[in-house]
Amino acid sequence: MSQSSPSNAETDEDLSTTSSSSSFVPIEQHQIQDAIQVIDENKEFNKNILPYVVKTTPISSVGNNYHIISVFGSQSTGKSTLLNRLFNTNFDVMDESRRQQTTKGIWMAHSPQVSTTKQMDTHQENIFVMDVEGTDGRERGEDQDFERKAALFALATSEILIVNIWETQIGLYQGANMGLLKTVFEVNLTLFGKSKLEKNDHKVLLLIVIRDHVGLTPKENLSSTITQDLLKIWESLNKPAELAHLQFEDFFDTDFHTLRHKVLQPKEFLEDVNELGDRLVVKKDLFRPNYHHNIPIDGWTMYAENCWQQIDSNKDLDLPTQQILVAKFKCDEISASVYEEFHQKFKAISSANTPGISTLDYQDLGLLLVDLRSDTLENYDLSASRYTKSVYEQRKDLLKEKLNEKFREFFDAHIKHLSEKSVKEFETNIVGLKGKNFDKEATRLTRETTDYFINSAILLSLENELDYDVHVSNLQDQLTKLIQQQQLVELKNIVNKSIKKLSSGLTKAVSFELADPTETSWNNILSKFKEFVLDFLSKNELEEEAGTYDFGLGTNRAQNKEAVETFKFKSWNAFYEIIHKIISKDNLLTLLKDRFDDKFRYDENGLPRMYQNTVELETNFGISKSFALRIVPLLTIAKLNDNSEILPDYDIFDSKLRAKYLGLVENEHDSEDEEDEEDRCFAEIISESEKAEVLNKFKKETDARFIETKRSIVQHVTQIPYYIYLVIMVLGWNEFMAIVRNPLFFSLVLVFGAGLYILYSMNLLKPAMVVVQRLIDEIIAMAKEKMREFLIDDHPTQAHNLQKISASNREKVEEEKVVETIEMQDL
């Protein structure tokens, strides 16, 4: 038409050449865009839909804010006229002087404005209207293939499908296009029903526009009649098994609107059209979110093209002849009959052979199922082979699928039980595998389990009619998963056992070296540590390929390498924990005190020291203290004899590495102390603050021992003055000479003198004096009691005294034992 843009020549050639005089609503002429043919009468899809959309409205501003409306109905019923009046488009309309087809194929136009009862701006709605070629036209005659495909295309791509129908057509089957709708519904369900399972809320609105409504029959009654017809059509559809549960309401919503006669009541007709427009511009009245395809307008053009290709290439869409219809009906009837008979027999077999029966023989059961299937198909062939071969074979294939679907349920139940049983037995056996033969034995178990499963599945597969490859694949995946899990468990056990062995050996080595640490102690400890690590690596390293490890579990190189890295990290972590366990603050203090006591209390020969004066005490105290403190630098920092610190191959304090190799997850408290952890040093065993604390305690305890020892020396000196010995010698000279002259006394003096010397040398003189004093006290007490008994002749008193003496004796004996124990401990 004259309004075509010359700048878009490739699109204009497909545009309508009709005069815009067909637009009956006053609107600025330059706003009306020519319609474009989407699909021509030769079933060719127009590639220039997107340029047309770009021309009519900016894509960037449209996005998902658009609506697609299609019209469907018999030829020459005023579909194009309705669209032009309602949406202000310029689709071709019929010349009433010549009753012939006007719209050929499918056309689409952009609605510049919707006609309403009030002046409302609807440009932002971006409504695109598709005018579909009318059905039941004389031009196509019995060739209704395009009509069905066009109707199906409109149904698949639109949000609202306007079904244009005269009031007089309601209640008719062919006249109301119910037969065509049935076929369209059935094919639509087949082609697009599976997507419904994933997108449950998407629907299409069937807007039934009842034309030439006189008003004698209320709209509600007409709506009820049409709804019942649609539901009957839906119930009679041949639905796929997986979609059989879906209802008409899952796919479609219905709404109704009546229009009065255009010629006899033109004013009322326009009012009805405008009222319909009111409903279109009100949000969420007719246009609802779940009607939209949720793709942008440029994506919709691609979606529409793909839909048409799928619809056009589907052979099931060809219009069946009457002969084919009869063949389909009879074959379906025969198929239903033989299937019912099959179902009764199958039900009995299923009840008698439930999964899990211990006496179940898969071979006999498989033969029984094959015979049942063969008998059912033979019964079908006997009755249905007389009809059209293509329909007979098609329905036979459908029957086979239906039988196989039923067999599949039974087959899957048994295969599932068989799979669970096989996996359970395999898991029990795989857990029991240990050692270097794990990989070989796991392969053998996998092969035996898989072979048994496949042989059993073949027996139940109706001579390989039922596919069991998926079940075999799932079983193999489960077995592989179990093997992989057990491989990791065994690999972890190997690493943990090796770490335990390393920890035990390293603990002994560290304890031995640190019992008397020297400058080379840490060299020896590190050498022993590396020896343990090397022993683990050498046992699992491949001879032909250095640096590659194999643990005999069938694990891949990455897993083996990960295990080696885990072992190394754990070994360094164990090294750190062992030295910190052995060299703690308390242990260091104990070790310092032991070294001090060894030097302070005993001489070079290991005999106890007896200090005679404070000079000797002070000298040896300094030497002992220096001897003890000499090990502090060696035990607080792990340094080699070249004064270098021991550095691990891994940062064992890194939280990510600890999580990776030790499985330690950092918590909030650990994250708060992250800065402190960054300052930690592997070689630092005792921190400076801990070191100062230990030295302070050590100083206090050694000073206390020094003071105690010095006090005993001073007491010894002050208690026995030297002049006493001179007085004793002068006053006891005669007695001394008498003893010397008497051999018996002299011998006793020598014996007692030697005994006293021995006690003195062994530092047992004081305990001996305590024992003698106790003995003398006991003798005196007993003598007093005997004297009292002799002088006082009182039997009760004597008995009471005897009891007291006995109790006293027991108490004193216990006290003596305690004193002796204390003295021995002091010694």
Swiss-Prot record:
Coiled-coil blocks: 389-409, 472-492, 803-823
SUPFAM superfamilies: P-loop containing nucleoside triphosphate hydrolases
GO-annotated cellular components: cortical endoplasmic reticulum; endoplasmic reticulum membrane
Residues in GB1/RHD3-type G domain copies: 63-291
Residues in compartment: Cytoplasmic: 1-719, 765-827
Record keyword GTP-binding present: yes
Region (Disordered): 1-26
CDD domains per record: GBP (cd01851)
EC number per UniProt: 3.6.5.-
Amino-acid positions noted as binding GTP in the UniProt annotation, renumbered to this chain: 73-80
Residues on Lumenal side: 741-743
UniProt keywords, alphabetically: Coiled coil, Endoplasmic reticulum, GTP-binding, Hydrolase, Membrane, Nucleotide-binding, Transmembrane, Transmembrane helix
Location(s), subcellular: Endoplasmic reticulum membrane
Membrane topology value: Multi-pass membrane protein
Similarity comment: family membership: Belongs to the TRAFAC class dynamin-like GTPase superfamily. GB1/RHD3 GTPase family. RHD3 subfamily.
Described function: Cooperates with the reticulon proteins and tubule-shaping DP1 family proteins to generate and maintain the structure of the tubular endoplasmic reticulum network. Has GTPase activity, which is required for its function in ER organization.
Protein name, as recorded: Protein SEY1
Organism field: Scheffersomyces stipitis (strain ATCC 58785 / CBS 6054 / NBRC 10063 / NRRL Y-11545) (Yeast)
